[in-house]
């Protein structure tokens, strides 16, 4: 984890790609997010934020969408001095052969402090998925 923290500390921008499981982060992603906790106690969350992008992949069809995944990633990355600025929805756009079959939708994030539970405003995408 020391090497991962060094890479995170040196990064000007972070790009995260994660599948969505039951509306949230899979265990491997959750383990990484949990390991960002020391940044919280070090006060890093108060520093200047660096941009982060989240690419969401999966088969789709979950009626609960993936708002929980976005919230988890947004909160944890904030502790490490990143601001989730883009969320790209690839759910249902990668075929069984691993080929991309369409363009990602860019989701519109609500500003922090608003009703983030609603996920996104109507627009380019929805955290409810297709």
State what each model feature region is.
Residues 1-75:
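Helix-loop-strand module that forms the ligand-binding subsite of alpha/beta enzymes
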Residues 77-130:
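Glycine-rich phosphate/pyrophosphate-binding loop and the adjoining helix
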